[in-house]
From Swiss-Prot:
InterPro entries: Formate_THF_ligase, Formate_THF_ligase_CS, P-loop_NTPase. Belongs to the formate--tetrahydrofolate ligase family. HAMAP family: FTHFS (MF_01543). Gene3D superfamilies: Domain 2, N(10)-formyltetrahydrofolate synthetase, Formyltetrahydrofolate synthetase, domain 3, P-loop containing nucleotide triphosphate hydrolases. Pathway: One-carbon metabolism; tetrahydrofolate interconversion. This is Formate--tetrahydrofolate ligase. ATP binds at T65, P66, L67, G68, E69, G70, K71, T72. It comes from Aliivibrio fischeri (strain MJ11). One of its GO terms (biological process) is tetrahydrofolate interconversion. Its EC number is 6.3.4.3. It holds the Pfam family FTHFS. It is an enzyme of class 6 (ligase). The lineage of its organism: Bacteria, Pseudomonadati, Pseudomonadota, Gammaproteobacteria, Vibrionales. Keywords: ATP-binding, Ligase, Nucleotide-binding, One-carbon metabolism.
Amino acid sequence: MKSDIEICQTATLTRMKTIASNLGLHDDDITPQGPFKAKVNIDALKRLKSEPNGKLILVSAITPTPLGEGKTVTTIGLAQGLAKLGESVSACIRQPSMGPVFGVKGGAAGGGYSQVAPMEELNLHLTGDIHAITAAHNLASAAIDARIYHEQRLGYDVFSEKNQLPALRIDPQRVVWKRVMDHNDRALRMVTIGKNEDGKTINGYEREDGFDITAASELMAILALATDLQDLRQRIGRIVVAYNLDGEPVTTEDLQVAGAMTVTMKFAINPTLMQTLEGVPTFVHSGPFANIAHGNSSIIADNIALKLTDYTVTEGGFGSDMGFEKACNIKAPLSEKSPDCAVLVATLRGIKANSGLFPLSPGQSLPKELFAPNKEALDAGLDNLLWHINNCAKYGLPVVVAINRFPEDTQEELDSLLNWVSNLDINVDVAISEAFVKGGNGTLELAEKVIKACQQETQFTPLYTSEMSLFDKLNAVAIKGYGAERIELSEKAQQQLATFEKLGYQSLSVCMAKTPASISTDGNIKGAPTDFVVPIRELKLCAGAGFIYALCGNVMTMPGLPEKPAFMNLDIDGDGNIVGLS
């Protein structure tokens, strides 16, 4: 079988103007970005406002191996399967970060014959949204340090009188806005800025700082959660970047940089329209990670897709304890649109990996034993699949399990898994997906069962309400969302929680940052752990995004490169074709 990029580069694609027209978009709704992608003007929503919403299908997964279990492949393949059944359908996915593209996982366009195309354009820059977010974010960083420098150089009173601006009196030790870049670079996690030659201060105030990956920026979350340009502007203005010497929050609005940040992101608020290999329209917008952010594509993209098609297929990052949980508890209450069906992706290798019988390490190849028949490992890993089925069902949604088939899978083990799921005393259906090898033809049974599931009545129930205290919300996610015994706040986190409550932020949602390798916060614990403690070492206020960000365990907001990064495989030939991208 050809490689992903070879399949994509030899595919016959439809011009984007035709894709958009068939979708119901007018010429003035789109701004073409070459022949096969276009920006969709957010103002199209005004024209579509009176149209009914279609069905929203949310794709999630069991606890994944480091290489993933095929959520995007299934998302794209399912959309293609629905289209082959004659349904009106679109897909919504996140824009890939170049960190993972050059790091461990490679690209995020799907794979095989279920890809978004052109995949090299999707995986590398696309229309520049992530770069715009990086620029806007670092503009705020520059504004913070410039303000500290000038106020301290002149003195607060002189600065205020000279510039007719209030002195913000930012405490340099309480700047909470790190810089960002769209690469995995562990060396930038902790840096010292503002260093000067002896006797000079021209480079600013020396202080400790650090970098996060752009996908972890609050601006990325804001882009994904904003409903229109005005909402984007207001959210950016609410961002707390530091605290002053009296312990009061300092916002981007206080720095008078929020407007310029929004201007920098003006084009980024418009989703990018692309297509699958079979011509299914696909909206690509925003790219928050699910382990260190809320892990879902944008509300704006969903809203446009739901107005234009009867079915919209989207995905939440990592397992159902991650992106799916955040879609239900953060995204859905804001969008006022809950999923109509949950599709849970499982693989034989992923179930075996959750048996706890094999060592797994990020950046390392999967053990060969995962690809061979192994009844003991398969049986031992079923607890994880059952946990994720129950987890999706607890939100009041019908669940369809999609068994993503790999070439080495045996029919005997597939049949065993099908029978096991079919015999569960739960509202769940199951089908094998061969989206990777067969495209839409490999998901026809899955598509039929998803249509059936979408016809069921749902009783969508998030884990918490806005009226609950922040502590109770954190506990709700840990206990009801993960099956933990309790949370355990560090002394620092306790102080931060008290501060946020005192400042009036108790109505915000909570966003847990933790390892995706386990339902718990310890990536070494596989299966369906119980009675564990969720340690929260630090809390961060994301007032613009509308949530409190809880750092659990040892999760990092700036990834590092593995021993053998994916960028080693990338090159370009004499004709300008990219090779080695997966």
